[in-house]
UniProtKB/Swiss-Prot annotation:
It comes from the Bacteria. Residues 219-231 have a biased composition (Basic and acidic residues). This is Ribonuclease 3. Belongs to the ribonuclease III family. Disulfide bonds: none annotated. The active site is at D63, E135. One of its GO terms (cellular component) is cytoplasm.
């Protein structure tokens, strides 16, 4: 694609992002950080941009910032809950389905910068991709304005869902399966990535879940995390004989 086309797409993104931040009641300093947060690797590949200009590094950072923010929120809100309960609650809040809820609620999915092929194959509605962008956005917000602003964003976008019990239907199967195995004294659970296939912008991961040294289920997903969730879901339903 041409440089002119790239410039048009980026300028359109920047205008939409500026409008979105105004709607949310936030300002920003470094627009380049947010552009990177919304740049999927397929977009970078289509325009032959620097391979590190996609959002994966910011996603890595945002994941940690999000866990810290949610941990502090739960620690303050539930002073009498033990560590195990807090961990379970945090897992529900920061799991992929929850992040998709947060992102879609404020329309972040509409602004993702995708390559032509990824757009055609439904990348804009893919849960793993949306949740990754949400984490990358949190990473960019942290670098641009600090933890206090991340906290204010969470107060507006994340915590209300928690307080209104809107995440009760979200299932973190890895946590559920781990707890079930522990209750049944069935040993340790581990996950192995057994296959990774497809082009860089459209990867498919296959993971297996190991219990007592035996592979008992497999799962596929667009990310390693998603494939492990699907494997855990299959194993959990298999052991509990849920259809």
């Amino acid at each position: 694609m041409s440089k002119q086309k790239k410039s048009e797409i980026i300028n359109r993104f920047r205008k939409r992002f500026d409008t979105k931040m105004t709607e949310l009641g936030f300002t920003y300093q470094n627009i380049d950080l947010y552009q990177q947060a919304f740049s999927h690797s397929s977009f970078i590949n289509d325009f032959n941009m620097n391979r590190l200009d996609h959002n994966e590094r910011l996603e890595f950072l945002g994941d940690a910032v999000l866990e810290l923010t949610v941990s502090r929120y739960l620690f303050d809100k539930h002073p009498n809950l033990p560590e195990g309960n807090l961990t379970k609650m945090r897992a529900t809040i920061v799991c992929e389905p929850s992040l998709v809820i947060f992102a879609n609620k404020i329309g972040l999915n509409e602004m993702i910068l995708l390559g032509k092929g990824e757009e055609k194959t439904g990348g804009r509605t893919r849960p793993s991709l949306i949740s990754d962008v949400f984490e990358a956005f949190i990473g960019a917000l942290y670098l641009d304005q600090g933890l206090d602003i991340v906290w204010k964003f969470a107060e507006k976008v994340i915590f209300p869902h928690v307080e209104q019990n809107e995440l009760l239907g979200v299932v973190d199967f890895k946590t559920q399966f781990q707890e079930y195995v522990h209750q049944q004294n069935k040993g340790d659970v581990t996950y192995n990535l057994i296959k990774e296939e497809g082009p860089a912008h459209h990867r498919l991961f296959t993971s297996e879940v190991i219990l007592q040294g035996e592979a008992i289920a497999e799962g596929k997903g667009k990310t390693k995390k998603e494939s492990e969730q699907r494997a855990a879901e299959s194993a959990y339903k298999q052991l509990k004989q849920i259809k």
